[in-house]
Structure formats: C-alpha cells, structure tokens
C-alpha cells in the first residue's frame, strides 16, 4: 500500500503537478456568509508533486468528523462518505479540465494511503519520544496515530462506497 502512488509516478501513470502539500481543513479559507471554501492558505509547502497527496490529505482531514484530536475517543472515528462526496464534487467540478483517467484510478488509494501514512508518522514520533510533532501530553501522538489507523480502517470498510462515489462523480463530471 505504501508505494502505490510513487510506483504509479515511476511508471508514468501519474504526472507531477503543482501541489499544496498541507491541504487540511485548517488551511482552507471559508467564506463567512455562504460557508463555501474560497481559497487555500499557508502556501509555504507548495511544490511539484502528485496532486493525490493533496486530495488524500484533504479528504482525510475533511471526512473525519471527530478530527485529528479525537484522543481517547479514537474508537469512534469514522470516514464520512457524505463529506467525501461533497468535497470530491467540488474539487472535480473545478479540476476536471486537467484530470486524466489515471487520476481517478488512484483516488481511493490516495485517501487510504495518507491516513495510514500519517498514522505511522504519529506512532513513530510517539515511540521516539514526541520529537517531531508537538505533544500536549506523553500519549498525545499515540492517540493521534490511533485516530489515523481507525480512520484507515473505516476508509477500507467503505472502499466500495468510496469507489462508487468517485465513479459517479467522474461520470457526471462533478455535477452529481
């Protein structure tokens, strides 16, 4: 699972494009009156890369109603497929002009991979004494890792639903 996107890039299946690098919910500017996303902020991580990392991270962040800091409630974490549909509809409605067939092919993988990868990063940091991610208490990064692993489990549980959402949106060009 860990190499799926990099392998696709190496095989020439996914092109490099400009990516944000940290498109979590906190980095999306929301218009106060409409509640609509109007801009992405915090541009210090912009670079050439695979847009799948951005899409996966955005969905990881935006489809976990309990958030990254669910802490001891980590067992209640789930992937919200309704949020997934809404986010992907909005994204694809704007990005359809440059998305290629393989972009859609690897969307599910990107969603699952980013949650799993972040879980590994939090867990590794916990084992190393919380030296990378700031921790409010000794088990903070352990709980953060459990949140991401539970989210990964939920993403895998909803695999068929997520793939159907992607297929529906692609067929309707983001207009579902």
Question: Which residue stretches match the model-derived regions?
Answer:
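Active-site activation/catalytic loop segments of kinase-like enzymes and analogous catalytic loops
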Residues: 52-96, 113-132
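Catalytic activation segment of kinase domains across protein kinase-like and atypical kinase folds
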Residues: 12, 26-67
């Amino acid at each position: 699972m860990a190499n799926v996107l990099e392998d696709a890039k190496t095989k020439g299946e996914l092109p490099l494009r400009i990516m944000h690098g940290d498109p979590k919910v906190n980095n999306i500017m929301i218009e106060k009156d409409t509640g609509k996303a109007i801009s992405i902020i915090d541009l210090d991580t912009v670079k050439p890369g695979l847009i799948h990392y951005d899409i996966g991270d955005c969905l990881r962040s935006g489809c976990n109603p309990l958030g990254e800091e669910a802490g001891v409630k980590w067992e209640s974490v789930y992937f919200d497929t309704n949020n997934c549909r809404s986010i992907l509809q909005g994204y694809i409605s704007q990005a359809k002009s440059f998305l290629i067939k393989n972009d859609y092919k690897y969307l599910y993988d990107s969603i699952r991979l980013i949650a799993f990868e972040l879980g590994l990063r939090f867990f590794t940091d916990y084992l190393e004494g919380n030296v990378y991610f700031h921790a409010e208490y000794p088990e903070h990064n352990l709980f953060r890792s459990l949140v991401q692993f539970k989210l990964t489990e939920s993403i895998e549980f909803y695999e068929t639903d997520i793939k159907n959402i992607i297929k529906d949106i692609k067929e309707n060009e983001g207009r579902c």
